[in-house]
Curated annotation (Swiss-Prot):
EC number: 4.2.1.59
Active site: H47
Main location as per UniProt: cytoplasm
Coiled coil: none
GO cellular component: cytoplasm; membrane
Protein name: 3-hydroxyacyl-[acyl-carrier-protein] dehydratase FabZ
Record organism: Thermoanaerobacter pseudethanolicus (strain ATCC 33223 / 39E)
Protein's gene: fabZ
Superkingdom to which the source organism belongs: Bacteria
Catalytic activity: a (3R)-hydroxyacyl-[ACP] = a (2E)-enoyl-[ACP] + H2O
Length: 142
C-alpha cells in the first residue's frame, strides 16, 4: 500500500503522517508499515539541532497509525477516527536518527465495541527501537 492509498484511509497529513507505506496487512489482525526517517523531518529542527533524534512519542504515534490502517480497512470502521485511550508498557530501546528505516509492526489483540487493543514493535534493522501496547477508540468525530 503506497502513501496515496494510506492518505485515503488515515486523516493525518504532513507533517504528522508518519507512515510512508504498508508492506503487509491482514485486515483487523496485523499490519506492517515503513517510515523512512529523513534529515528533513520538521521535528529535527528542535530535537536536537546538533544531535537529531526522533522523539519516542512520534515512534509510538507511527505505530498507532499503522494500527489504524489495519482497523480502518474493516467495513464497520471505514471513515471513522481512531483516538488514543491509552498507552501501556511503552519502552524505548534504540535511538532513531536520520537515515534510519523504521519497520512498524502492529498486532491487533482485540476489537470490542469500537475499542481496539494492539501491540506494536518498531525496529531499525534487527534492533528493537520501541515497543508499546496501544488502546484507541473508533469514533465518528473527535
Amino acid at each position: 500500500m503506497e502513501n496515496k492509498d494510506i492518505r485515503k484511509i488515515l486523516p493525518h497529513r504532513y507533517p504528522f503522517l508518519l507512515v510512508d507505506r504498508i508492506i503487509e496487512i491482514e485486515e483487523g489482525k496485523k499490519a506492517v508499515g515503513i517510515k523512512n526517517v529523513t534529515a528533513n523531518e520538521p521535528f529535527f529542527q528542535g530535537h536536537f539541532p546538533d544531535n537529531p533524534i526522533m522523539p519516542g512519542v512520534l515512534i509510538v504515534e507511527a505505530l498507532a497509525q499503522v494500527a489504524g490502517i489495519a482497523v480502518m480497512n474493516i467495513e464497520e470502521f471505514k471513515g471513522k477516527l481512531g483516538l488514543f485511550t491509552g498507552i501501556d508498557k511503552c519502552r524505548f530501546k534504540k535511538v532513531v536518527r536520520p537515515g534510519d528505516q523504521l519497520v512498524l509492526e502492529v498486532l491487533i489483540d482485540s476489537i470490542k465495541m469500537g475499542l481496539v487493543k494492539a501491540k506494536g514493535v518498531a525496529k531499525v534493522g534487527d534492533e528493537v527501537a520501541a515497543t508499546a501496547e496501544l488502546m484507541f477508540i473508533m469514533t465518528e468525530e473527535g
